[in-house]
Amino acid sequence: MKSVIFALFLVYLLIVRAAEANENIGLGLDRGSSGTIAAKQQMGIELANDPNGPGRRRRAPAENEDFLKHS
């Protein structure tokens, strides 16, 4: 019971502070499952094309050589 009251108190503080700062509260409910997948895809594309990012994933050359030897 105390944990529920504490959680409600934290939510209340979040709402009060957001109202004081004139900000909207984002609870993650504005985007559905397909929107989340599309957002992750877009972030991955942006990271792959970013010059300072990790780049795109490439397979190790040893795997490709083994595949070519057996064919």
Curated annotation (Swiss-Prot):
<keyword id="KW-0732">Signal</keyword>
<dbReference type="GO" id="GO:0090729">
    <property type="term" value="F:toxin activity"/>
</dbReference>
<feature type="signal peptide">
    <location>
        <begin position="1"/>
        <end position="21"/>
    </location>
</feature>
<feature type="region of interest" description="Disordered">
    <location>
        <begin position="45"/>
        <end position="71"/>
    </location>
</feature>
<dbReference type="GO" id="GO:0005615">
    <property type="term" value="C:extracellular space"/>
</dbReference>
<dbReference type="GO" id="GO:0008613">
    <property type="term" value="F:diuretic hormone activity"/>
</dbReference>
<comment type="similarity">
    <text>Belongs to the scoloptoxin-21 family.</text>
</comment>
<dbReference type="GO" id="GO:0001664">
    <property type="term" value="F:G protein-coupled receptor binding"/>
</dbReference>
<dbReference type="GO" id="GO:0007589">
    <property type="term" value="P:body fluid secretion"/>
</dbReference>
<keyword id="KW-0800">Toxin</keyword>
<dbReference type="InterPro" id="IPR034439">
    <property type="entry name" value="DH2-like"/>
</dbReference>
<keyword id="KW-0964">Secreted</keyword>
<protein>
    <recommendedName>
        <fullName>U-scoloptoxin(21)-Sm1a</fullName>
    </recommendedName>
</protein>
<feature type="compositionally biased region" description="Basic and acidic residues">
    <location>
        <begin position="60"/>
        <end position="71"/>
    </location>
</feature>
